UniProtKB/Swiss-Prot annotation:
This is Fatty acid oxidation complex subunit alpha. PANTHER family: TRIFUNCTIONAL ENZYME SUBUNIT ALPHA, TRIFUNCTIONAL ENZYME SUBUNIT ALPHA, MITOCHONDRIAL. The lineage of its organism: Bacteria, Pseudomonadati, Pseudomonadota, Gammaproteobacteria, Pseudomonadales. Residues 312-715 are annotated as: 3-hydroxyacyl-CoA dehydrogenase. Its EC number is 4.2.1.17, 5.1.2.3, 5.3.3.8, 1.1.1.35. The active site is at 451 (for 3-hydroxyacyl-coa dehydrogenase activity). Heterotetramer of two alpha chains (FadB) and two beta chains (FadA). Pfam families: 3HCDH (PF00725), 3HCDH_N (PF02737), ECH_1 (PF00378). GO terms for biological process: fatty acid beta-oxidation.
């Protein structure tokens, strides 16, 4: 062994060729933490000092190559002063440059995922051979930053500015054939041939058959574009990417600006430009929020994984109630490998459920994301039925019938008699108490809530609701099944609205107050969309359904009358009475028309103003900032209450629930991180300015205590 560390080893293979292997001890993946970077420096120095070494193959001892930088470690660095952070970045980059400058040829053998710093390591090599099972990419923009280990310098010089901009600004993972096509890798081979292919390539470079120094040279020079070509490439890209990313996500455009600024410099000066821009981005609130989301997501996955130890494997599932929701659940289960029975009480429901699943599958086939054979396999995994005949072998049943407690209780009690004693029953309810529904069951310990969000195939969140008598086995099995379906489960305790709807309705409450104060709902929508929401509250209410919102509002008012009950009629009441139910019947706050593709498109409908007139009680002058505060303060305070009441266990879960469940602006990080960004004391003072609007705007005693003590939700 030439070098041996805890993350990296260097050993001789044959004929002066060595293997530099990443294999971080005690971890399932390789990542660039301080230990790995230090050992890479030592390994490179060792290779440089050994004149007998003729070539280097870089490999991985794990199923992945390198997943990138250890963000949990590096996020602390982002708090350092700018100059210190720039110096640290350049010091790390010198390690990659020293590797690139070795006086021998180098080949990266990419066996699995190589992302971020993992791909940047590969770019520092002279050649790259990629397994057909691998994927590569630079996803840093998803964290609000851009590549900081030379990615903005080497990639454009290797594959051209246009291709590099597309890779870096999109932040997606790229398949082997796409990587080969643009020249990001030199060869793609079957996994079992990877080592031999890398060895063959390095031998040909060592022998002089391949000129590795000529291959390396473009990465060390300025970008090979003249002034006119640069202007065309960069200005066009900046305009297009700015339109795609929007003003709240600066990283993609900043990456292009950095490539442009560094275009006329050689590698070392270009790396200085990259470091300066990287530090600037790392300090933005968007980066801090998006990195916070990433860390929260890791915490969520860790918590969900902990349930695996006691979870029962769901080999056969069932859904009660077909229709669009049942069809979506059936599609999601079958497409992820769990066969499912789809039961309804009539043929129409079955047809609707199958049509929904088929529509989703055809969409995937049309986009090239699924083969026709796979589509047939998934459809075969959905078995429609009008009876309970085959329910004796079902491991978990999702009840998805109408949102009515008596109907749900009757259906659940009925199915309980048709399944095994240990079958888990899960109710897909958005507002009804799980403990209440459990009263109809003989085995309430086997019963939980499993709240899917609509549309099921698109929304990543599933709330798994623990009732008073739900067992840990039932919770664990439902969490594991949700994960198997490709969802992000969050376990919450039972209360009206659970987490997401309990927090959403105070937001709608703020909206109702604004409309009753004479504020134009179109203006409110525009301001909240500019704030970062995917759609404004009026449009969201139309999409959810005015009738659904009306029912949910009443449930929440009954559950929390002190702050959610309003004796005055509001916009949702008059729209409901006028049978303007939203998108579902073509008119709500807006009117809806089908576009050329048959997709619903909202249009202005002046007639709604007459409908709303009776609930406009005053004409109040409010600023754009007021509108944001009227909307956001109730949502944030209810999130705080959910955490204090133990409905959700951690701040991370609360914030992720809102991002995944209702589209809370990711660049703001979630409600609790949003409070942190303002400052807890400042937020309490802000809420107090709106105290006259009612109890929804009154901070809790505990939040006031946090403000007094200078505390925050995230350290």
């Amino acid at each position: 062994m030439i070098y041996e560390g805890k993350a990296i080893t260097v050993k001789a293979l044959e004929s002066g060729i060595v293997e530099l292997k990443f294999d971080l001890k005690g971890e399932s993946v390789n990542k660039f933490n301080r230990l790995t970077l230090n050992e890479l420096r030592q390994a490179v120095d060792t290779i440089k000092a050994d004149a007998s070494i003729k070539g280097v193959i870089v490999s991985s001892g794990k199923d992945v190559f390198i997943v990138g930088a250890d963000i949990t470690e590096f996020v602390d660095n982002f708090k350092l002063p700018d100059a210190e952070l720039v110096a640290g970045n350049l010091e790390a980059n010198k390690i990659f440059s020293d590797f690139e400058d070795l006086n021998v040829p180098t080949v990266a053998a990419i066996n699995g995922i190589a992302l971020g710093g993992g791909l940047e390591m590969c770019l520092a090599a002279d050649y790259r051979v990629m397994s057909t099972k691998a994927k590569i990419g630079l996803p840093e923009v998803k964290l609000g930053i851009y590549p900081g280990f030379g990615g903005t310098v080497r990639l454009p010089r290797l594959i051209g500015a246009d291709n590099a901009i597309e890779w870096i600004a999109a932040g997606k993972e790229n398949r082997p054939e796409d990587a080969l096509k643009v020249g990001a890798v030199d060869a793609v081979v079957a996994p079992e041939k990877l080592q031999d292919a890398a060895l063959e390539l390095i031998k040909r470079a060592v022998s002089g058959e391949f000129d590795y120094k000529a291959k390396r040279q473009p990465k060390l020079e300025k970008l090979r574009l003249n002034a006119i070509e640069q202007m065309m490439a960069f200005e066009t890209a900046k305009g297009f990417v700015a339109g795609q990313a929007g003003p709240n996500y600066p990283a993609p455009v900043e990456a292009i600006k950095t490539i442009q600024k560094a275009a006329n410099f050689g590698r070392d000066k270009a790396l200085e430009v990259e470091a300066a821009g990287f530090v600037k981005l790392a300090k933005t609130s968007a980066a801090q929020s998006l990195i916070g989301l990433f860390l929260n997501d890791q915490e969520l996955k860790k918590k969900a994984k902990a349930y695996d130890e006691i979870a029962k494997d769901v080999k056969q599932a069932a859904v009660l109630g077909a229709g669009i929701m049942g069809g979506g659940i059936a599609y999601q289960s079958a497409s992820k490998g769990t066969p499912i029975l789809m039961k309804d009480i009539n043929e129409h429901g079955i047809e609707q459920g199958l049509a929904e699943a088929a529509k989703l599958l055809v969409g995937r086939v049309d986009k090239g994301r699924m083969t026709a054979a796979k589509m047939a396999e998934v459809l075969n995994g959905i078995r429609p039925t009008l009876s309970y005949g085959d329910f004796g072998h079902v491991d978990l049943v999702v009840e998805a019938v109408v949102e009515n407690p008596k109907v749900k209780q009757a259906v659940l009690a009925e199915v309980e008699d048709k399944v095994k004693e240990d079958t888990i029953l899960a109710s897909n309810t958005s507002t009804i108490s799980i403990s209440l529904l459990a009263k109809a069951l003989k085995r309430p310990e086997n019963f939980v809530g499993m709240h899917f969000f609509n549309p099921v195939h698109m929304m990543p969140l599933v709330e798994v609701i623990r009732g008073e008598k739900s067992s840990e086995l039932a919770i664990a099995t439902t969490v594991a099944y949700a994960k198997k379906m490709g969802k992000n489960p969050i376990v919450v305790n039972d209360c009206p609205g659970f987490l997401v709807n309990r927090v959403l309705f105070p937001y709608f409450g703020g909206f109702a107050k604004l409309v009753s104060a004479g504020v134009d709902f179109v203006r409110i929508d525009k301001i909240m969309e500019k704030f970062g929401w995917p759609m404004g509250p009026a449009y969201l209410m139309d999409v959810v359904g005015i009738d659904t919102g009306h029912h949910g509002r009443d449930v929440m008012a009954e559950g929390f009358p002190d702050r959610m009950k309003d004796d005055r009629r509001s916009a949702i009441d008059v729209l409901y009475e006028a049978k303007r139910l939203g998108q579902k019947n073509g008119k709500g706050f807006y009117a809806y028309e089908a576009d050329k593709k048959g997709k619903q498109k909202k249009v202005a409908d002046p007639s709604v103003l007459e409908v709303l007139k009776p609930i406009v009680y005053e004409q109040r002058e409010v600023t754009d900032e007021d509108i944001i505060n009227w909307m956001m303060i109730p949502l944030c305070l209810e999130t705080v209450r959910c955490l204090e009441d133990g409905i959700v266990e951690t701040a991370a879960e609360a914030d992720m629930g809102l991002v995944y469940g209702i589209g809370f602006p990711p660049f703001r990080g979630g409600a609790l991180r949003y409070i942190d960004s303002i400052g807890v004391a400042e937020f309490v003072a802000l809420a107090d300015q709106y105290a006259d609007l009612g109890a929804l705007y009154h901070p809790t005693a505990k939040l006031r205590e946090m403000a007094k003590n200078g505390q925050s939700f995230f350290g």
